[in-house]
Amino acid sequence: MNYQQQLANSAAIRAEIQRFESVHPNIYSIYELLERVEEPVLQNQIREHVIAIEDAFVNSQEWTLSRSVPELKVGIVGNLASGKSALVHRYLTGTYVQEESPEGGRFKKEIVVDGQSYLLLIRDEGGPPEAQFAMWVDAVIFVFSLEDEISFQTVYHYYSRMANYRNTSEIPLVLVGTQDAISSTNPRVIDDVRARKLSNDLKRCTYYETCATYGLNVERVFQDVAQKIVATRKKQQLSIGPCKSLPNSPSHSSVCSAQVSAVHISQTSNGGGSLSDYSSSVPSTPSTSQKELRIDVPPTANTPTPVRKQSKRRSNLFTSRKGSDPDKEKKGLESRADSIGSGRAIPIKQGMLLKRSGKSLNKEWKKKYVTLCDNGVLTYHPSLHDYMQNVHGKEIDLLRTTVKVPGKRPPRATSACAPISSPKTNGLAKDMSSLHISPNSGNVTSASGSQMASGISLVSFNSRPDGMHQRSYSVSSADQWSDATVIANSAISSDTGLGDSVCSSPSISSSTSPKLDPPPSPHANRKKHRRKKSTSNFKADGLSGTAEEQEENLEFIIVSLTGQTWHFEATTYEERDAWVQAIESQILASLQSCESSKNKSRLTSQSEAMALQSIRNMRGNSHCVDCDTQNPNWASLNLGALMCIECSGIHRNLGTHLSRVRSLDLDDWPMELIKVMSSIGNELANSVWEEGSQGRTKPSLDSTREEKERWIRAKYEQKLFLAPLPCTEFSLGQQLLRATAEEDLRTVILLLAHGSRDEVNETCGEGDGRTALHLACRKGNVVLAQLLIWYGVDVMARDAHGNTALAYARQASSQECIDVLLQYGCPDERFVLMATPNLSRKSNSRNNSSGRAPSVI
């Protein structure tokens, strides 16, 4: 075992010890809090539940299950629209539940293969597969919905992520297309040919179509994957030989038993009425009482025998707290946690690099053991031993840094980076239907010899003569998928010629460019004691003549916002590119995970991800509103539309009076903004702004920026394609009042696009005085209220009785409208709302021959 593997194992062990030992202090804290519950009956009921949880934890499978009981570990991945949660629930309970679980779940069930019982561990992953997941599974089920294109494309992304962490030829794969969501209004979009092509691309894995509503092929999927795992193990045993045969039971994974997060109440089985044979929160053990599971061990010097107080029954595996000092015990726990290396982030990349000293006069280069962790921190230590002991180390927070390679100009940022947190949309910017995976030696090629904009190559591992495996990598961050780049030892590649931008960080870049890279800077001319060749052939102006000289520059620099620099050097340029790419990905991930300091009412991360996903699910939002680029990640708030990053830059130049641009990934999203975006969408927006564009060619992904800018300015600034007004009999302001009262969103958008500030502020009449904002707030419609404010309605306006729109929002009990009005400076005056006459809701346009304005409520 090499030292990196040993280090990773050691870190994983320490993390598991920390997790395990963190449980009983929390349980003790619950017992102490229970003493504050004054009602005895409630106190005892809660205590019994805590005791049951405690006993279930201490009697988990790693402590009780015999080693003769084998385990099968199955991972299930797919985005929120894939239907994977319904698939698992149907298999476990025999019933159908439509809701998808964003956080996934952990489940256990007995399964019989070839007459032998196995403990089936099912891990429903809430997001893309990570390294821990990839190393844990025995097999993976990829799930997509037959009516959802994005969930289909997500499988390519998740497969490539798996290939980054593990050789996919080692584990069985199964592809599942779910039919649950198909209906007359929601037709199938993934035909059988495309689905089977995907199964061939995924190393010719088995493909099933399932329906959780009535159980089609559900049992068959899990039975097949279990049989594949058993067959793979037998094959491995035969290949190893009798002297090194594998044990009957694989090592028990503490991760599975420890991270049981989802609790599902078992329902009646198919025809028996008894409890189902699975449990998602405790291991499947024989039906034995808790007392029978306990073994009284005589006290010894090494094994303390704690005694529970009657009023505070606690697990006999935990030490007694009777008479102990809570502060001392807490300190003891902390010190013990420190001794096992608690709190250390697990590195995602590590190795020896040269670092240039920033203090010494000669700026000498010294060896450092460098680690990059998934928390966005890069650390370096004088040696591996110092890292293991966690001494003499220094950290670099990558959040406010960028990484540079001397002598190379940063390429144009590539487009189609998608949100991390949104499980359904993964930012797949290209059509991946042309993907091909070659069966020989894990290499991957596209459909043709040349790079294609629509082709993406996936790979698992590249074999090397020394028996080691070289892992592939891409420019995508933890939950993102961007246009991959062609790197010497990369396995994920696509054409970068169409790339325009990146979601959040300009430092994310491709490694190739259609143009020659500029020569290295004079910094590369310094002699390094570890350099194999000298790069001294620079011209007087610091320019180099050949590309080979540029590649000999093995240095990369991390630069902070404060101007501080850290110089590192690798041994090969492949290693340098790998470090640069990994650091760029962590910079992007850090930017996307940082919380805004604005004091806004934000949703939880999970609910916000679901809310943003609802925006992406709006009709037309899978493509840019102006150029049809796939998976746009930028929004125009007042237009209610999504766009690509290049078009968003053009929209910014229009001014906020025409387009208010915001990033889906990087900016705050209060509820009122989410409601606006999830109420309009690109299809509705273009039905207003592009209705008159017949015969005109709309820009595409391949169009130049100038072509896109001409289209956007003609569309929004000159309003050349805007739909005509629906009615000319009444003034625009009166039509706006009517449309607001009827909550006709499309008409309101159209009238606001045509209207001026004066027309938007027109009132119902002298005896009424209400503006469209008053009417929107009376309805409690925060979407219309927000749109009216953006288009210039006066939030200070009062009706004939002196009431502002805030009074109407309070009457409607619409906290969202109240918050928006206060945010824009509406006076917080709590007057008693004076009634205004309720006029007929029906339009008088047909019978109104005198030209009176249409009445509103």
From Swiss-Prot:
GAP activity stimulated by phosphatidylinositol 3,4,5-trisphosphate (PIP3) and, to a lesser extent, by phosphatidylinositol 4,5-bisphosphate (PIP2). Phosphatidic acid potentiates PIP2 stimulation. InterPro entries: Ankyrin_rpt (IPR002110), Ankyrin_rpt-contain_sf (IPR036770), Arf-GAP_GTPase_ANK_PH (IPR051282), ARFGAP/RecO (IPR037278), ArfGAP_dom (IPR001164), ArfGAP_dom_sf (IPR038508), P-loop_NTPase (IPR027417), PH-like_dom_sf (IPR011993). Residues 275-289, 501-513 have a biased composition (Low complexity). The modification Phosphoserine is found at S521, S605, S663. Residues 346-588 form the PH domain. Pfam families: Ank_2 (PF12796), ArfGap (PF01412), Ras (PF00071). Gene3D superfamilies: Ankyrin repeat-containing domain, Arf GTPase activating protein, P-loop containing nucleotide triphosphate hydrolases, Pleckstrin-homology domain (PH domain)/Phosphotyrosine-binding domain (PTB). The modification Phosphothreonine is found at T836. It comes from the Eukaryota. Residues 67-241 form the GLD domain. GTP binds at residues 78-85, 122-126, 178-181. ANK repeats lie at residues 768-797, 801-830. The modification N-acetylmethionine is found at M1. GO terms for molecular function: GTP binding; GTPase activator activity; GTPase activity; zinc ion binding. A zinc finger (C4-type) spans 624-647. It is found in: Cytoplasm. Phosphorylated on tyrosines. Residues 524-534 have a biased composition (Basic residues). Its main location: cytoplasm. Widely expressed, with highest levels in brain and kidney. Homodimer. Interacts with several subunits of the AP-3 protein complex: AP3M1, AP3S1 and AP3S2. Interacts with GUCY1A3 and GUCY1B3. The PH domain mediates AP-3 binding. GTPase-activating protein for ARF1 and, to a lesser extent, ARF5. Directly and specifically regulates the adapter protein 3 (AP-3)-dependent trafficking of proteins in the endosomal-lysosomal system. Belongs to the centaurin gamma-like family. This is Arf-GAP with GTPase, ANK repeat and PH domain-containing protein 1. It comes from Mus musculus. The lineage of its organism: Eukaryota, Metazoa, Chordata, Craniata, Vertebrata. The gene is Agap1.
